[in-house]
Structures are given as C-alpha cells and as structure tokens.
Amino acid sequence: MTSPTPTRRISSSSHATIKPALKVAILLLLAFSVLVALGPGPSDLAGASPDPDPAPGAAVGAAAGDGYSCNPLGTATCALPWPSNFATHADGVSPTGLRLNVSDALFSPELNAHLPGASRPSAIYDGTSGFSPMGPIMFEVPAALDRESIQARDSVVVFNARTGERVAIQAQHDALAYDDEVSTNVVKVWPRVTFQWGERYVAIITDGLKQTDGQPVPHEMKLVNALFGDPNAPLTKWARARQAEVAKAGIDPARIRQMTDFTVRDQAETAAPIKGIIDEIWSGDVPIRINAVHDLHGVAEMDYAIEGEMLTWQLRAPGGVMDLNRREPLWLKFDLMVPTAARHRQVPVYISGHSLTLDRNQARASWGSLATEGFAVIAIDQPHHGSRVREDLGDLTSFQATERFPWLISAGGQSLVDHLRLLRAVETTVSQIDRTGPSGTSDGKPDMDGSRTSYEGVSLGAVVGMPFVFAAPTLDAAITTVGAAGWIYSVANSMLVEVIHADKIANSAVNGSEAALLIGTAQHASDVVDVPAFADMIRRARADSGRQLRLLLNHSWGDQVVYWYGGERASVLAGVPYVGPGAPPAGSIITKTTGDASGGWAATGYRDAYGDWMGPTLNGLMPHVSFVNPGIAKIVGEFRHRFVSENW
C-alpha cells in the first residue's frame, strides 16, 4: 500500500549553488521548451492538444493483470493521485471508450480484511466506464500545508481537457487524513457542481500550494523523471501530453507539482439501474396493509389517521451491501392523515421526509396546518431511523467501524427506492382508501387523488430525499429545506460527521490517505443512486398529465450541518433560479434572478442572521435551523398554497 517515493538524484559540483527547487523548475521549463520544439508549433498547440492514448493505464501496465493498485506517478501512498486514467483499459463498446480495471490491492490488506468482498475496490470500480462526476480528486503531499493557500485560485486547478474550461472546485485539507491515527496530508477536491459526464479532466497542484513554512509544495519527482524519460515511453508520452494541455489551458507548466487526468463515467449507463427499477415499480401496484384506523373527529380539520405498512424491497444484502437486483420483501410502517376536506373532494397527498434522528412521527407536527390546506399527509421512516433501527442494525450513530461502510453507502439508495415505491403506493393503493364522505363515513369514492402528490423534506429528508425529487417520474411538487445534492458528499463535509461517528468508518485504514480514499470509493459506489445521475429527468413532463414538477429549494448559506455547497449544487443541477432574499454571499456559484419563489422553479437562500460572535460550532449550526425562520416558513406556505388554488 505504501512505499517511499523515489527521488531522482541530480549530481552537483563545487560550482553548483542552485537550490534544488529552482533547479527542478528550470528543468521543467527546459522540458516544455523541448516539447514545443519537437512537437507542434506554438500556433498549432494553441488550436489542439495532443491526442492522448485513450487508455494510458493499459499502455504503462498500471491496469494490467489483476488491475490497478499503484499510480506510476504515485506518492507515499502509491494509489494517489486519484482518480487516474492509469486505472483504465480500452473498451470498444464502452460509451467512453474506457473501462476501469482496479485491484483490491488499491486498499491495504488491513483495510480489506474489514470489508465484505462486494465493498472492495474491484467490486465497486471494475467495469464502470469512468469515474464519479462528484469526484473527489485526491493528492497527497509530504509536509503539513498552509490551509489558507489551498483556497487560492491557482493552487489547485481542474480543467476540461477538451475545452480547457476551468472547473469551479472546493479544495480542502482532508479532515479524515489529518485526524487519522496515522495522519497524512491530503488535498481533496470536489466539484462545486459536477464534472461533466463522459468528459476527461486534468487536475494539477501548482506552486501556489504552500507548506506551513511558506515554501511551495515540492515537485513529485516521479513526474519530473517521466517528463525527462524516453520520449517513446508511454509514461513520458502521457506526461508531456498533459503538460501541453496545461499550457493550452493558460497555466505555466513549470508551476506543476503533481498531476492526474481522469474520464468521467457515462450518465446513461450510471442511471440505468434506477431507471429500470422505476419502470418495474410503475408497471404495477404497490401493496399496503392497514393495521389501525383512528377517528380524529374533525379536530384541526383532520378526519382520520391510519397506521399501516407498505411493501418495499430490501436492497441491502447481509452486511449492508447495496444490491439493486435484490427483491426481498420488506414491509415498512407508514402513518397517514386524511383531512376533512376529503369528505367533499379527493384531496392531494403530501409525502413528508423527516430529519436526522427523528422518524415518521415528525410529520404529525404539520398535520394540522396541512389539513387546513386540504392535504393528506403520509410518511415512512428513513433507513436507520424509527421502526427500522433494529432491521438496519443500529441508527446513524452506529457507524463506528469499517464493517459499517456498506451500510453508509446503501442508506441513500435504500431511501430512494423506498420513496419511489411509496409514491407509487399513493398512486395505486393508498389513494383508493375510502373511509369518509359528506356524512363522515365512506361514500364509495376514493378519499385521495393519487395523481396529485407533493414531497417535502427537511435536513436529512432533503439530502437522502433529493435523488427521489430528481428521479420520481410522477411527482407534482417538491420542497426541500437545508438539503443537498450528494449523500456521501454531505456526510463527508458535515460538522456532525464525528457526532454520528461516520469518521470511524475509516478506522481500519492504515493511514489518513487511505481513509480519504475509502470515502472517495464510497462516492463512486453511490453514483448510481445519487442526484447527478437523474439531473436530466427533473424537468421532464409527466407522461400522464403533461405537468412538470414544481420545485422550491431552500438552503442556508453558512450551514455546516448540511454543508451549503451541496444546496447550491442541487439548485444548479435542477436549473432553478435563485430568487432571494438578498444577494448571494461571496463564494456562491449562483446569481440572483428576478422572480417569485411561488412561480414553480426557485431556490432561496438565507444567511446566518445571528452573526459570527457565537464561535465556530454555533456559527455552523444556527444556519441549519433556518427552517424555523419565519421568512422561509412564509415562502413555503405561499408556494404550497398556490399549488392547491392555482394548479389543482
């Protein structure tokens, strides 16, 4: 797993007084000069980058045999930098022309010993057409970093190799690597939105990234050696081609310290499993069982409540591994409230997604207000919550060992399929319930209209619920508050990661770099059930009615519980305009658009109204509770009311 990084010895004499770092910089400039002299002329170079080997990993042997485990330009942890097209081989039927070929030796024996086979690298990566559109990219550096320099615009650069366009990124000193028992220095890079499907990217660390002593991070000597290697050698060809692409993108190649390139997997291939599940679910009815009915006597305009169960599929094999082909029956408890409005008309149905540590009973707090607006309300428990804790072998605070790694990954996918089946149950079986009418008793007509459905998720319900909002083919409206696009991203970036012990998932890693790599692998495994896979579905009109989803996304700037970058990512992927209140803060990737939040497609953002005087913990926590902000409550209420009065 780990090996010392070899360095190239450059002989010196009593006359040589040039500092090593300066010497390397000069050599890199010379190498680039030779590349330009022997290759295309400057005008040609400006118009087209060298045609790269479509599968450089196969060419250098990194992905041969049992698969990739070590980057030929690797650092002390030789799998890094990651991701890398060195882990690919050519495939004529792949939509990207590539397939990943990764060995379980990407992880140390110590880490693999705590993972089931289906959660090891080969099972997660092999055969996919590229890497995650969410990243993250990881570089390891040998010395402690100046944290502020990571935020500099030119310290870490990622650009599209085809267009040269730079990508908005979130570069960070990885907390897992820093806090690990055997700490390392890892720079982790997430896209602020996504890396585009099917595109190839080049990522570099430059001399803008500083160590704590103020000096630039050193050159990776394996890269220097490759640049000065045999010009016919595959690795040298790769290094020089990437160097030329860096120059074409407007960056001085002499500034490069480390470098990787990678191709993003294909969207259609990634989304296919869930799209197949959607077709399967919508091909029939979803059974329910009614266990108890409670007469609410019209209090707060509520007619009756039902405790019941819905049949879903347990997609988690023993050990928690997600298997989207699994169809083990699983009955989930639900609570349903039907308002008195159902005595006179079929009422729309509101699906409620609860917050972290709560359960389906959270919806009961809004029964009264939603009943007055004429909504029926239904809710189920999220994985690891409420009635599901025993089945899932613990709540979200139970992730205290690497053995729980599969459960963390599969929680998002299980929630997605559960809610797709709940929506279909509302359309086919729940909506057929008839227990009230003009006289307060059944009248032979269904009480609910299953074709008019809304979803509202708050906090956890707006994170694991976000893929459902994007993928659900017949949902009419959705409201999310302090949510995000990216389940693993949100876990990795939450200030609560230690509170729910998600950091202990990586306890069996041999060092901090491997711990970071494990979380990156979790993201790749989650792609098939994550928001980006369904970004092309959210604006599609319903086949049955032609209606489009109406969407309101509320996020809170400064939120460190559900990190606010994830909220902005969801807004951009959904293509919704930001309508206020106020102007976005510095660092935002969205701009304010004139409009009305109740117009159907909107994102709102709130700043922390409490100031910065409370200290880092409360400053990160208080923006998250913005869902109790009267301003947000007013916008949500207006948005919801207009759907009842104007659209339905």
Task: Spell out what each predicted region is.
Residues M1-P20:
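N-terminal secretory signal peptides that target proteins for export/translocation
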Residues A25-A37:
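Bacterial N-terminal signal peptides
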Residues A37-D51:
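Signal peptide processing junction and immediate N-terminal pro/mature segment
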Residues D51-V293, V299-W313:
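Acidic, low-complexity Ser/Thr/Gly/Pro-rich repeat segments typical of extracellular/periplasmic
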Residues A292-R343:
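N-terminal cap/lid segment of alpha/beta-hydrolase-fold proteins
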Residues A411-Q414, P473, A477-W648:
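C-terminal subdomain of alpha/beta-hydrolase-fold enzymes, centered on the catalytic histidine
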Residues G440-A492:
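Primarily recognizes the serine-hydrolase "nucleophile elbow" in alpha/beta-hydrolase
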